[in-house]
Amino acid sequence: MITGKTKIIGIFGDPIEHTLSPLIHNEAFSYLGLDYCYVAFNVKKDKLKEAVEAIRALNIRGVNITVPHKETVIQYIDELSDEVKNIGAVNTILNNEGILKGFNTDVNGFILSLKDEGISMKNKNFLILGAGGAAKAIVYGILKEGGKVYIYNRTPSNALAIKEKFKKFGFIEIVEMDKSVTEKIDVIVNATSLGLKKDDPMPLNPELIKPEHVYCDIVYPETPLMREAERIGCKVVGGIGMLLWQAAFAFKIWTEVEAPIEIMKKTLNKLLTKD
């Protein structure tokens, strides 16, 4: 039951209608008897500053930040965690009496989503598609775990910026897309939002994917490229695992309580079965 004391948590993004975050967080709040409510807000790029100001004005406890705001939101935040300083992208904000602090739980969310599937990162070659906020967190996580990173992005300057930012943490190289690249790759990661919309192009030509590849996608409604990878015979890791684990870390930041992982997992499985 929502009362005058209920703490509000939100998520800012565009598009946002597909998000499962309100469902899993509200189920977790209910299970633990916490007086919180999680709500989705469709925030356009030109309204982001006003939306962040509203966190303070409305005394919202915290929010998740998703595409396309993970990088641009930084300029409106008071304090940044060490990981955000290293990555340059925020996916979680905590409001502590009007002081907004940005965190990035995508890093550990991605690492644990692969570990859950028995996939080690150490000494593996990763092809990262994209060079936005999510890609930064994923690249940082892979390098932290001892993997090697190859980045393909349609705008080379963005990929170069990531290389310069993260080369001190490990091996990172920018590539053009052809078979000679994918032949040495162990894991392909789509770190773009391509696949969310019906008319989106595929981020990679499926002909370059082989059965021995692991294919990962940060998007959690199944994308056309995920279906192609499954058809080819790849092990496929969707965005659900990353969603679960980044949510668990964010949950603790807001509530100071350990997230009920199994309840959140069951909720996600029910939602996926329903779909």
From Swiss-Prot:
Active site (UniProt): 70
Assigned EC number: 1.1.1.25
Involved pathway(s): Metabolic intermediate biosynthesis; chorismate biosynthesis; chorismate from D-erythrose 4-phosphate and phosphoenolpyruvate: step 4/7
Residues that coordinate or bind shikimate: 19-21, 66, 91, 106, 220
Molecular function in Gene Ontology: NADP binding; shikimate 3-dehydrogenase (NADP+) activity
Annotated Pfam families: SDH_C, Shikimate_DH, Shikimate_dh_N
Reaction it catalyzes: shikimate + NADP(+) = 3-dehydroshikimate + NADPH + H(+)
Keyword Nuclease found: no
InterPro entries, sorted: Aminoacid_DH-like_N_sf (IPR046346), NAD(P)-bd_dom_sf (IPR036291), SDH_C (IPR041121), Shikimate_DH (IPR011342), Shikimate_DH-bd_N (IPR013708), Shikimate_DH_fam (IPR022893), Shikm_DH/Glu-tRNA_Rdtase (IPR006151)
SUPFAM superfamilies from the UniProt entry: Aminoacid dehydrogenase-like, N-terminal domain, NAD(P)-binding Rossmann-fold domains
Any one GO biological process: amino acid biosynthetic process
Parts of the chain that traverse the membrane: none
GO cellular component: cytosol
UniProt binding sites for NADP(+): 82, 130-134, 218, 239
Keywords: Amino-acid biosynthesis, Aromatic amino acid biosynthesis, NADP, Oxidoreductase
Family: Belongs to the shikimate dehydrogenase family.
Function, in words: Involved in the biosynthesis of the chorismate, which leads to the biosynthesis of aromatic amino acids. Catalyzes the reversible NADPH linked reduction of 3-dehydroshikimate (DHSA) to yield shikimate (SA).
Quaternary structure and partners: Homodimer.
Protein name: Shikimate dehydrogenase (NADP(+))
Highest classification ranks of the organism: Bacteria, Pseudomonadati, Nitrospirota, Thermodesulfovibrionia, Thermodesulfovibrionales
Gene: aroE
